[in-house]
From Swiss-Prot:
GO terms for cellular component: chloroplast. Binds 3 Mg(2+) or Mn(2+) ions per subunit. It catalyses: (2E)-geranyl diphosphate = (4R)-limonene + diphosphate. Residues 1-32 form a transit peptide. Substrate binds at D342, D346, R484, D487, K503. This is (R)-limonene synthase 1, chloroplastic. It is found in: Plastid, Chloroplast. The lineage of its organism: Eukaryota, Viridiplantae, Streptophyta, Embryophyta, Tracheophyta. One of its GO terms (biological process) is diterpenoid biosynthetic process. Mn(2+) 2 binds at D342, D346. The Asp-Asp-Xaa-Xaa-Asp/Glu (DDXXD/E) motif is important for the catalytic activity, presumably through binding to Mg(2+).
Length: 606
């Protein structure tokens, strides 16, 4: 063991802890002593050995530290904050002027898709309560498929029990749907993704609308309405229910601006909200990038992916609202660390090394880690060790809640699942699909990320809710499986090529003899059925999870759909991810020089 400390290889510096004030009570002092950061004494035990290691040849990040530190936005100025507050006040007044139920539903839909719903939660809830509790038999439930579908989708989204039988009025004597109205079909298609298991009417609605939308897209009729054409294309690619709110907002603002019935008040507020959030994200990225650079992981562990900005995109997608800054910080760093550890287990580490690393995480013993781990693993382990302890100390200080055991166990579950897959690879074992998924729902990081989201984004932490999350409830189980399957659809080809354990597609092919095309379609069908299970849970009024925690979980799954829809958006940095990262994080939406008109009601033409 070397007796000197090399400053350039410290896993984390004391500077990372300068922002932490002294503990204010005896319990906190004791905990802080337990959580103090550790410096790395590099061991040469393994470093001189020649080991044949695989390489994934990952490309470096296109967003480097210097670029992130150069970010600067005008939207942090007080003038913009005052203007945004003024606009929100005007919108609240205008919302009260919208009387007709259909106009109210369209207003809510616009608020959600423009990224403004979190600013008007009370107003939205009041409107939906009135619509749901109104015993009046609205005419649209028999005559207007668009309105009926919109009402169904919004009510189910917000947890109101609505029967699928509201659509019986739009079926013929043979039970088939009757509709030649494109707007109604599109609305029904979006509503069908809120279906539950066993709802035959909603399944028929999905089949009918999917077939019809594909036929229309093939035809040339869509040239008459570019806006509807773009909506149809995106709906077939990914429904609204599966889209990340912040990503949808950036696209919808652009589309909404082109609409003849746009409301200028909502449009300006949406642009202002997006730009001010983007300014917040940029400041957060600068701080996190400094932390990441101090660890030295990106520089020293060159075999691993350096995906800090992609990691931030995940955290922003999970918790985009301004009040979740600390949650985004913890999630971003966690996902960046997960990425490095994943590459160690998938590509770089030997099986013996991986078993020792797993043992070190289970022991959570710094002396054991320093004695037994090779140098590159010391850096990774100590970065994880110090960060988890910093996180635990921060929450203890803020809430007098010791989360160390919970977060350690969550990380250990992931590491153990990684080891299972590494053993499968080294033994050339191909599991059956169900066996693969039971381990894969953990190795995809779903349980860990939702635990981190809850612990970093909740104040106060509720012990009962945390224990429920730790029990692997159905909503975590099925959401994580969807995450796993979507990841496999986007990454399996690249991962198999560079040498990795068979993914769900290959497992199904091996188990059934199916072609890859058939296997991929089977995986897609599985995901849609799993979403029905998730929908049932979110509709459960007796759930111990808060709405915020549930939304964290749903947004994690939605982010997986985005990241892996066109390939490996996290690891390979495909063009879709690069473009979205640029528009979301670095490119503000232009505002008009003069203030826009404020007279029109948000739900109607402006």
């Amino acid at each position: 063991m070397s007796s000197c400390i090399n400053p350039s290889t410290l896993v984390t510096s004391v500077n990372a802890f300068k922002c932490l004030p002294l503990a204010t009570n005896k319990a906190a002092i004791r905990i802080m002593a337990k959580y103090k950061p550790v410096q790395c004494l590099i061991s040469a035990k393994y470093d001189n050995l020649t080991v044949d290691r695989r390489s994934a040849n990952y490309q470096p990040s296109i967003w480097d530290h210097d670029f992130l530190q150069s970010l600067n936005s005008n939207y942090t100025d007080e003038a913009y904050k005052r203007r945004a507050e003024e606009l929100r006040g005007k919108v609240k007044i205008a919302i009260k002027d919208v009387i007709e139920p259909l106009d109210q539903l369209e207003l809510i839909d616009n608020l959600q898709r423009l990224g403004l719903a979190h600013r008007f939660e009370t107003e939205i809830r009041n409107i939906l309560n009135n619509i749901y509790n109104n015993n009046k038999d609205y005419n649209w439930r028999k005559e207007n498929l668009y309105a009926t579908s919109l009402e169904f989708r919004l009510l189910r989204q917000h947890g109101y029990p609505v029967s699928q039988e509201v659509f019986n009025g739009f079926k013929d004597d043979q039970g088939g749907f009757i509709c030649d109205d494109f707007k109604g079909i599109l609305s029904l298609h979006e509503a069908s993704y809120y279906s539950l298991e066993g709802e035959s009417i909603m399944e028929e609605a999905w089949q009918f609308t999917s077939k019809h939308l594909k036929e229309v897209m093939i035809s040339k009729n869509m040239e008459e309405d570019v806006f509807v054409a773009e909506q149809a294309k995106r709906a077939l690619e990914l429904p609204l229910h599966w889209k990340v709110p912040m990503l949808e907002a950036r696209w919808f603002i652009h589309i909404y601006e082109r609409r003849e019935d746009k409301n200028h008040l909502l449009l300006e507020l949406a642009k202002m909200e997006f730009n001010t959030l983007q300014a917040i994200y940029q400041e957060e990225l600068k701080e996190i990038s400094g932390w990441w650079k101090d660890t030295g992981l990106g520089e020293k562990l060159s075999f691993a992916r350096n995906r800090l900005v992609a990691s931030f995109l995940w955290s922003m997608g999970i918790a985009f609202e301004p009040q979740f800054a600390y949650c985004r910080r913890v999630l971003t760093i966690s996902i960046a660390l997960i990425t490095v550890i994943d590459d160690i287990y998938d590509v770089y580490g030997t099986l013996d090394e991986l078993e020792i690393f797993t043992d070190a995480v289970e022991r959570w013993d710094i002396n054991y880690a320093l004695k037994h781990l090779p140098g590159y693993m010391k850096m990774c382990f100590l970065a994880l060790y110090n960060f988890v302890n910093e996180f635990a100390y921060y929450v203890l200080k803020q809430q007098d809640f010791d989360l160390l055991l919970s977060i350690k166990n969550a990380w250990l579950g992931l590491i153990q699942a990684y080891l299972v897959e590494a053993k499968w690879y080294h033994s050339k074992y191909t599991p059956k699909l169900e066996e693969y998924l039971e381990n894969g729902l953990v190795s995809i990081t779903g349980p860990l990320i939702i635990t981190i989201s809850y612990l970093s984004g909740t104040n106060p932490i509720i012990k009962k809710e945390l224990e429920f999350l730790e029990s692997n409830p159905d909503i975590v189980h099925w959401s994580s499986k969807i995450f796993r399957l979507q990841d496999d659809l986007g990454t399996s080809s690249d991962e198999i090529q560079r040498g990795d354990v068979p993914k769900s597609i290959q497992c199904y092919m091996h188990e059934t003899g199916a072609s890859e095309e058939v296997a991929r379609q089977h995986i897609k069908d599985m995901m849609r059925q799993m979403w029905k299970k998730v929908n049932a849970y979110t509709a459960d009024k007796d759930s111990p999870l808060t709405g915020t925690t549930t939304e964290f979980l749903l947004n994690l799954v939605r982010m997986s759909h985005f990241m892996y829809l066109h390939g490996d958006g996290h690891g390979v940095q495909n063009q879709e991810t690069i473009d979205v990262g640029f528009t979301l994080l670095f490119q503000p939406i232009p505002l008009e020089d003069k203030h826009m008109a404020f007279t029109a009601s948000p739900g109607t033409k402006g």
